[in-house]
């Protein structure tokens, strides 16, 4: 694994300070070179910081990640305010996913998708075949919502290993996907990436917020309006907690 760029504390999480181009190039370098050990990649936003502030186990997990990129615009703003001399750009998981799938230099990379529902995964694979014809999808798996047994985890690892996957994209929701990414990186010589809603966005089962809302930090209002029951706690509790965490841990 190439040396990771330095990290800087924003709230309760240590983030990799890079531009989008630097982040995707670092991932591409990983994927083009054989690995002897696994690598964990996280795309973290304000909600990840809020959760890490409340859960020390999750905080330790995130801060042990190999790469932790700034997935949310408010996190980028905080990084620029706290560390103005560093390179801070939004490294949005769905955008990074599309960049990697569509990069002709990565046509030999083998992709495995873990998470979401069977319907979404089928649509996702079909969409990738149409939009990114050079991308090699070697497998996908929709695990049950309950906690898997040890036997199920061993079977999962075996399927991934036998598929020859280079990268495993994990979309199990926060924080579950972050735990799974690090478990996979410890078990297999692959790159495991926690990309959240990227599955739904790529499969066109959930619409993304307009670009102007993403850039202005208002994406959360769009998502909350569309899914108030599911996302109310995430934003109405998480946003104030994020602000408190940033203030508490400022250098």
Question: Each predicted region: which residue ranges?
Answer:
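Proline-aspartate-enriched helix->loop->beta-strand connector
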Residues: 160, 164-174
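A short helix->loop->beta-strand "cap" motif at the edges of active sites that frequently abuts
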Residues: 36-38, 109, 188-191
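A transmembrane-helix-recognition feature enriched in membrane-embedded lipid enzymes
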Residues: 74-77, 81, 209-251
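A short, gly/pro- and small-residue-rich
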Residues: 56, 60-64, 178-197
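Short, flexible loop segments at boundaries between secondary-structure elements
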Residues: 142-148, 189-226
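Conserved beta-alpha
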Residues: 76, 80-159, 163
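Short gly/pro/ser/thr-enriched loop/turn and capping motifs at secondary-structure boundaries
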Residues: 75-77, 176, 198-203
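N-terminal nucleotide/polyanion-binding subdomain common to many enzyme families
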Residues: 1-91
